[in-house]
Amino acid sequence: MKIAVIGAGVTGLAAAARIASQGHEVTIFEKNTNVGGRMNQLKKDGFTFDMGPTIVMMPDVYKDVFTMCGKNYEDYIELRQLRYIYDVYFDRDDRITVPTDLAELQHMLESIEPGSTHGFMSFLTDVYKKYEIARRYFLERTYRKPSDFYNMTSLVQGAKLKTLNHADQLIEHYIDNEKIQKLLAFQTLYIGIDPKRGPSLYSIIPMIEMMFGVHFIKGGMYGMAQGLAQLNKDLGVNIELNAEIEQIIIDPKFKRADAIKVNGDIRKFDKILCTADFPSVAESLMPDFAPIKKYPPHKIADLDYSCSAFLMYIGIDIDVTDQVRLHNVIFSDDFRGNIEEIFEGRLSYDPSIYVYVPAVADKSLAPEGKTGIYVLMPTPELKTGSGIDWSDEALTQQIKEIIYRKLATIEVFEDIKSHIVSETIFTPNDFEQTYHAKFGSAFGLMPTLAQSNYYRPQNVSRDYKDLYFAGASTHPGAGVPIVLTSAKITVDEMVKDIEQGV
């Protein structure tokens, strides 16, 4: 069969490879000049920067794409586990190194507060149990009809997840120490979630880091996008770049998706899998006579969106890779207040920031004697933060100054401005324009209880035959391992439909 995949982000690349490995003819359409989507790369002034995700968690999910296509993952990506997850800075003289080794972890916890290990381990145990339930009964399955969700098994297993509790509540149930609470709560921002609103399951990330380890891909995270692109080429997939989709064509008589309009041409296909950002697809790519019924264009703005980010890609003329960790977090003096600012639409003047220094793990990512630095500052998305004008150069200059002051918390970056030889910024406006991410949301729809599982945009269209969706705004959600799972379960449903002649 002829299959079209819209979008060459990590979801589209993984899905296309899985489909092609089943013997089908697959074409990927990507509007940008390169593959990767939000897993993007910037090469500038001799530096190589990952532009989006940077932390490799759940490596088996990465490997699975290659092995399920009959390939050896080691021929495409080179993974290695990190001994230390990150350095955390509460202020300049208060730094904690978070290890993966259990004995070192206990020592770290006890140094923060004697006796805190028990609560921390109880937290990890509780979250691991919830993760196993969620993975088996909710995350790795699709919901094609109401009975797939509304059944006794889902009711019983869902009750065990205690989804009415929020991430903050679960953390505070086990952890009394404010520093350790911050360590756990901050990580919900990795997928754009407000810990006060996100279901307690989304405090899962610290557990995943501890249980499965944190890894690094040679060449940076973009090495995964390159590996997937090569996998697709090896499987005979055709990747068309600079190919902007104008419309998904729906046959009104048979209510099926049978073509796409791309760069002015109508291209016929047997099935279409769309991995572009779902809200933008529902708003802009469906014909007027054939909207997605649950998500018509006029309702898209009313959905809840994850936060956005202001990113900086900085090159400096000194090599500091032996003085800083690969991954670093610098906390705001008022962490809770900063969270409120992000999700109430206000700009922070004392943000918590994430700092990634890829040459610590791979010297090839910066010129000899120099260092590339990636900085992420969580911000409101464009709807909640409608009062922030990201096109205002005076404003972005002010934010850069805020970030440079915050970077000075790390001693080696105290005089960073005098060493800058390259600087690039990426704003919420850029997320919206570059990736068609609605409201510049960095992680798609926020996974609130009302936008999770059965209530999230589904992988198989309920309105039109031969139309499928995958990606961060669809089930099961955002984050690289999760969108890879989205690709897997969606392709499984498509292959099942093909085998059954649906």
Curated annotation (Swiss-Prot):
Domain of life (superkingdom): Bacteria
UniProt keyword annotations, A-Z: Carotenoid biosynthesis, FAD, Flavoprotein, Oxidoreductase, Virulence
Pathway: Carotenoid biosynthesis; staphyloxanthin biosynthesis; staphyloxanthin from farnesyl diphosphate: step 2/5
Taxonomic lineage: Bacteria, Bacillati, Bacillota, Bacilli, Bacillales
UniProt-listed GO biological process terms: carotenoid biosynthetic process
Name of the featured protein: 4,4'-diapophytoene desaturase (4,4'-diaponeurosporene-forming)
Binding-site list for FAD: V5, I6, G7, A8, G9, V10, T11, G12, L13, A14, A15, A16, A17
Enzyme class, spelled out: oxidoreductase
Catalysis performed (reactions): 15-cis-4,4'-diapophytoene + 3 FAD + 3 H(+) = all-trans-4,4'-diaponeurosporene + 3 FADH2
Function: Involved in the biosynthesis of the yellow-orange carotenoid staphyloxanthin, which plays a role in the virulence via its protective function against oxidative stress. Catalyzes three successive dehydrogenation reactions that lead to the introduction of three double bonds into 4,4'-diapophytoene (dehydrosqualene), with 4,4'-diapophytofluene and 4,4'-diapo-zeta-carotene as intermediates, and 4,4'-diaponeurosporene (the major deep-yellow pigment in staphylococci strains) as the end product.
InterPro entries: Amino_oxidase, Carotenoid/retinoid_OxRdtase, FAD/NAD-bd_sf
Pfam families attached to this UniProt entry: Amino_oxidase
Keyword Oxidoreductase part of the UniProt annotation: yes
Similarity-based family: Belongs to the carotenoid/retinoid oxidoreductase family. CrtN subfamily.
Any GO MF annotation of the entry: 4,4'-diapophytoene desaturase (4,4'-diaponeurosporene-forming)
E.C. numbers: 1.3.8.-
Gene name as annotated: crtN
